[in-house]
Amino acid sequence: MRRFVLALFIGATVSTSAQKVGLVLSGGGAKGITHIGLIKALEENNIPIDYITGTSMGAIVGSLYSMGMSVEEMANLLKSEDFSQWSSGEIPPELRYNYHNATPKPTIVELPFSLNGKRIDSLQIKARFLPTNLVPPHQMNYAFVPLYAQATAAAGGDFDKLFVPFRCVASDVYKKEAVIFRKCQLGDAVRASMTFPFVYKPLTIDGRLLFDGGIFNNFPVDVMQNDFKPGFIIGSVVSENPDKPTESDPFSQVMVMIMNKTNYSIAKNEGFLFNFKLDDVDMFDFTPVDKLIKMGYDSAMVHQDTHLPHF
């Protein structure tokens, strides 16, 4: 009798574990808004999301959901004027008095230098200022504090204690390795994960200068497998490995130089992959929110009966 009860208990435990679902969200800039539509479809089909891992825009969407935001709340945030301002670095006119404004000059580009040493021919000339980012970081840094502070405090900085256990990935370019965030300020982790080189200013955490997680791991399915070991993995990919660069496209040249190739795949016996082809979507254009959400939703609904788990 005891063996029978024990067998039932073990069977129930295995069954419960096997039903756990992990959601992996790739980076891809504004294309990652598509992830929200996929989440909406999963919710409507009563498919639970037990764990989330994400990179860059996948980290933003994943973190918002992991701290309890609904699909509607995420969509409204991305369509808000506040989001537009902190993603572009634009400072509202009524707040500009809080910031130092440089004296207007007729120059297009100015690179001030300082001399370190008495002799110029010693080549001890160091740049005092060179721009490290195109988008000013102030708006984003200020916005992330109230956005993520409550969730961080409630979880005690432990991502396992969020509404949905969560991981995100950034890149340490000095050590040339991915950095997995499990415990820290949630806003800092997300901010580091989405810091695309030259667009956003890098963040220093624990002495490490961190950039966009997509440099070394743009689709953290391995993090999902190693940290959570779910019974079924749903992947959402809105990016692809860079094409061969061309002479006339400096952006493609930079992408090839900084981005490692990512394995965008999930084994058939481990889950299902949604691979969205969004070639006509600008990764820095965050305006077509409803369109991208609908694309993610429609694609998921097509595959719900044949490829997704049933509960």
Spans of features found by a protein language model:
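Histidine- and/or cysteine-centered catalytic micro-motif in compact active-site loops
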Residues: 1-3, 238-239
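Sec-dependent N-terminal signal peptides
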Residues: 3-16
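Patatin-like phospholipase
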Residues: 17-55, 63-311
